[in-house]
Amino acid sequence: MVAGGLHGRTKRPQVGVFDGFMFLIGYLYSRIVHRADFVVEEGVFEDLDGPMIVVCNHTCGIDPFLVSAVMPRRVCWLMAEDMRVGWLVWFWNWAGVIFVARNRHGKSGIRRARTHLKDGGMIGIFPEGHIERPYGKLLPFAPGVGVLVKRTGARVLPVVIDGTPDVATAWDSIYTSSNARVRVMRPIDYSDSGLGSAEIANDLEQRFLDWTGWELGSRKTREVQHDELTDDVVQSISDDSRQIA
């Protein structure tokens, strides 16, 4: 455990031995089970100071683990409130998960996310709100991601994911091997862009379409895979963040 912790600390110098050990476990899981290929654009990890919103496309249930495995900073993921199940509470607490209710009560989670960003933290979000199905088609980005970016002034760190398991449920992806690829793109600063919330969401959506080369689907016409980890969180942000002064 000590060796693992020291290895993790070389990647994340600001964390303790236990956190470093957990990082090592996640990294080895990603590389062994999913044969993950981590591609980071030059200079990105030297430019991660300050508040940051990690924006990813959503391919399967293990996406947060893959992304966290490569990040030199802790990513606090936004998660649906009803995933706060008893036997996983210790893990969610350790991971710093920010729970967001699927209804009007979600504003407390959104407020916590904004506070975390104000304190210079990093949060992770999937603007599609659901897992992409059929595999290889991007779901429209919900406007909530633009609201969060606009209101906080945080920079966006785009992460493009592909090659993950095309399986029936989000949980199946945990033990199904794959050839995953995680691409960390350069941060985007929208603070002086003059774009509104909806325009920011649209701009991010178009960037991901360009990066993936995929087509844009529609929730109304296509089947989506239910994912309790992130389902409806972004829509909750869209609905509730407007009520927060």
Please provide the spans of the model-predicted regions.
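Non-catalytic C-terminal accessory region of glycerolipid acyltransferases
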Residues: V2-V17, F21, S108-A245
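Helix-to-loop junction immediately C-terminal to a conserved catalytic motif
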Residues: G26-H58
